[in-house]
Curated annotation (Swiss-Prot):
A GO MF term: transmembrane signaling receptor activity
Organism of provenance: Homo sapiens (Human)
Distribution of this protein across tissues and organs: Expressed by NK cells.
Disulphide bond pairs: C49-C100, C149-C198
Glycosylation sites: N67, N84, N144, N178
Domain of life per record: Eukaryota
Residue ranges, Cytoplasmic side: 265-304
Function noted in UniProt: Receptor on natural killer (NK) cells for some HLA-C alleles such as w6. Does not inhibit the activity of NK cells.
Family to which this protein belongs: Belongs to the immunoglobulin superfamily.
Name of the protein: Killer cell immunoglobulin-like receptor 2DS1
Amino acid sequence: MSLTVVSMACVGFFLLQGAWPHEGVHRKPSLLAHPGRLVKSEETVILQCWSDVMFEHFLLHREGMFNDTLRLIGEHHDGVSKANFSISRMKQDLAGTYRCYGSVTHSPYQLSAPSDPLDIVIIGLYEKPSLSAQPGPTVLAGENVTLSCSSRSSYDMYHLSREGEAHERRLPAGTKVNGTFQANFPLGPATHGGTYRCFGSFRDSPYEWSKSSDPLLVSVTGNPSNSWPSPTEPSSETGNPRHLHVLIGTSVVKIPFTILLFFLLHRWCSDKKNAAVMDQEPAGNRTVNSEDSDEQDHQEVSYA
């Protein structure tokens, strides 16, 4: 086996001591793969186990293979402890599901909870499948998209990956149609584009995948509100409710304003009318009033 590490020891010595470490004493660490978990044959991959708990040792275990449990001294930097397990030349017998654990020096029999599982897959072993998009690689926003992965090879499972995402989607291959086996991955209404690839695998070797399909760029154009009418945005035949809301709102504001304006105009006109009537009184009345006023003035002078 070509699994190499800076320093390692089989944790089997615990069995020789007649004791198996207790798990779950500390929080689980994290397990990452650099540059990624899909590895071509003969390439190098680094499995990094790290934690904010200051573990003195890290153990790496592959499911189903007890003898593949490896141990490394942890490195401490900036409040983080970590260990890098290096697979220098990827081979089929090194693919599988890995987990890591942490332990401290004063309690070597007590391990942390296991990290989340990490599947290391070797790719490029079989013929590449084809990847296509329905209705096409360029779609309107909100339009339903389905990606079809197909091949003449009788793959049992297809795997769809998207650049920038850590996990793949998988579907079993359907029945043979026109000489090909395929799986259809519905993506639902399109919102964002992306670059996709797909792989094929067989049931008896789930960690050994085919070559990657050619990359497929899915582009999304347009605005969902413009491209796809919604209950709040029907077609022009039924009118636009947003415009209707604006009109209704404007009308509600205008009605009381109009009533108030009418009331003010009516009052102003009434005042003007009364003023005009006063101006048109007979001259006799005005004379009498004047004489009465003079008469009163004379009386006041007499009394003086």
